[in-house]
């Protein structure tokens, strides 16, 4: 086992108010990542069917693996509907507020949930009913059951109503049931689930810092329908934020596996690299705004890099500032993590690709430049300059396609009532 002990201590060091906002942002990356990926995939294939199928395989491959991880971290036991609900409340596919989910608990074998606001729906509705059907029917049907599979293979998630919306302003946006019937044939693992589960990344152990008495240390209690991240203790919330990063890296690995099947290894990695670059910039913009770092500079770049979701779990992050220079060192907790053939963003970093690191810096301060990157037995080292005299870099073309997404523009309500603090 690889122990995830040092690489994200920046979460544990944040003031609680900042930690809550950063954890929300980290969860939200689960929706930003497909806003970065799918345009690049469409340009590579000119096929919406390919987009739908890669999305299906991406989420089906990764979600059972990361659901199991979150269940262990949060002490979620059992194979009931409430256990499924708790895991969904901690799934980056259901980021809080952006996907404003209401829950009606019935018993251990059934519940209903509905979306008062679905940012993903509002993203695709301008493109017409066919794209809405692709997301809300073609993709949702298999991926929902795959997520529930991690808790109970006989669970089924089925719609009471869902988009395309009739009438066009129908609320809630959709309404679903979760039911467990012993007579159901068990759902089996998706074709890539075992491959994702066997990755070195998936085997990292997420250890918490010393607990303080400022919130829940797990979710072994009854379901709280209006669960919020602010109900968790600081150490638990920091661990959950690390787990959100893990979810997103496992999704990137699963996405690469799905891409390779359709476009081959070389093109798959090229598509993934563009996703990494786009996400680096956009997620940094949001983190910088959340942390009040509008003025940029080397210290601001360093602060965001310590927290950014595109950098791999399982690595210690040593970020140092000297004048207008930032040095980022990523040291793997186990040598098997530094694998150039590892699928996903981890493999990009392990091969010495620097695009995501550079754009993550530029999303904080467009004057930032990646001056050098090196991969050695001890890890990855990047040198970044943030010179006051430098010209502002242009936003990557891959990131421009995210500009109008509701996920990119979404602003969280950080009032105490909405955060649960």
Region roles according to the model:
Residues 1-112, 119-145, 149-175, 181-421:
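N-terminal accessory segment detector
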